[in-house]
């Protein structure tokens, strides 16, 4: 069982006053959605080029922890392209120099590609970047037709050239004085979340099956009186495994929110939409924002099954806990 060899002692995750999660990159953008309680939508002043956000196939979220008067932003993932990430951060008025840390969910290009060149625009300083050591591997998806989708990994030298302090870790990591938890490898315990069977990675001996994508990791925040907020890039470990692993790591059973990709799109994963949704209903997740690779069918099933918890994610949306 992947992850079972890692120590899973309860982690001392400091509770915070609140957290704001801003969707910086996602597959979907809609500037006409209305605010709802705890959810603020981006409002464009006009349809000129200056203040328009862009969507792309990728994910990035700004996770801003609130403790007293202090606001501490962490960038989780960087989307696919520098053009989209840089533009959206500018439009959303996010000062790059205010970032406290960066976390990469896994080594697929649609989660790290946007970081290229980003920090050359800001004053030179060292910024920690947490990444799993398997994220450097070259990957690809092989379709039933024989077509291949290459997934270029990040390059350590390029990240360090940006002024980033690369922190490789398989296990969990605490950031911001114990207020943000990076999960590290996710323990796989469900019977139905079996990985990505057409996913491959290059090793010294050539290409080999890599269905488990062991570098998949998420960030977890514990909000006082509300519970855990989990932000997950693709949930290649399985969204239910991600949820249960967060509970196991922290000892907290209340889930205030789950934001990010469920990777339930396509014929391989659609058969597990049902048990995934059932598990989230049973967990009584407070808010759910199924983004990026969740897939049209899964999004609609989640919306129907959890109407009070469901929030349609979109680039520029800020959800507060």
Predicted regions and their residues:
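N-terminal amphipathic/basic leader segments beginning at the initiator methionine
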Residues: 1-41, 173-183
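Beta-strand-turn-beta hairpins that frame and shape the catalytic cleft
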Residues: 16-19, 67-73, 174-182, 222-229, ...
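Metallo-beta-lactamase
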Residues: 134-217, 281, 311-320
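Short acidic, glycine/serine/threonine-rich loops at helix termini
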Residues: 35, 140-144, 270, 302
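Active-site metal-binding loops of divalent metal-dependent hydrolases
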Residues: 25-27, 78-80, 107, 134-135, ...
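Active-site metal-binding motif and surrounding structural segment of the metallo-beta-lactamase
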Residues: 83-131, 250-257
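Conserved beta-strand hairpin/beta-sheet module of binuclear metal-dependent hydrolase folds
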Residues: 26-30, 35-92, 212, 216-231
């Amino acid at each position: 069982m992947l992850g079972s060899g890692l120590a899973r002692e309860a982690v001392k995750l400091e509770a915070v006053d609140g957290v704001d999660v801003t969707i910086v990159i996602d597959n979907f953008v809609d500037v006409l959605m209305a605010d709802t309680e705890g959810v603020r939508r981006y409002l464009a002043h006009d349809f000129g080029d200056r203040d328009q956000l862009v969507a792309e196939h990728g994910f990035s979220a700004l996770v801003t922890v609130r403790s007293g008067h202090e606001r501490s932003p962490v960038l989780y993932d960087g989307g696919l392209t520098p053009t989209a990430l840089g533009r959206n951060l500018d439009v959303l008025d996010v000062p790059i120099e205010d970032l406290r840390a960066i976390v990469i969910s896994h080594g697929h290009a649609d989660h790290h590609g946007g970081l290229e060149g980003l920090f050359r625009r800001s004053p030179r300083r060292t910024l920690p970047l947490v990444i799993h050591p398997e994220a450097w591997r070259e990957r690809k998806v092989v379709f039933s037709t024989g077509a291949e989708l290459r997934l270029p990994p990040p390059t350590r030298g390029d990240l360090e050239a940006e002024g980033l302090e690369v922190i490789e870790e398989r296990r969990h990591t605490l950031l911001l004085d114990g207020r943000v938890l990076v999960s590290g490898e996710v323990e796989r315990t469900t019977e139905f979340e079996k990985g990505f069977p057409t996913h491959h990675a290059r090793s010294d001996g050539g290409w080999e099956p890599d269905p488990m994508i062991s570098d998949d990791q998420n960030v977890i925040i514990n909000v006082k009186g509300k519970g855990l907020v989990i932000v997950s890039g693709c949930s290649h470990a399985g969204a239910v495994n991600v949820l249960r692993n967060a509970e196991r790591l922290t000892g907290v059973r209340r889930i205030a929110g789950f934001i990010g990709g469920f990777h339930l799109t396509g014929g391989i994963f659609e058969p597990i939409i049902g048990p995934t949704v059932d598990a989230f209903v049973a967990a009584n997740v407070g808010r759910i924002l199924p983004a990026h690779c969740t897939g049209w069918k899964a999004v609609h099933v989640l919306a129907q099954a959890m109407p009070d918890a469901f929030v349609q994610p979109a680039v520029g949306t800020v959800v507060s806990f």
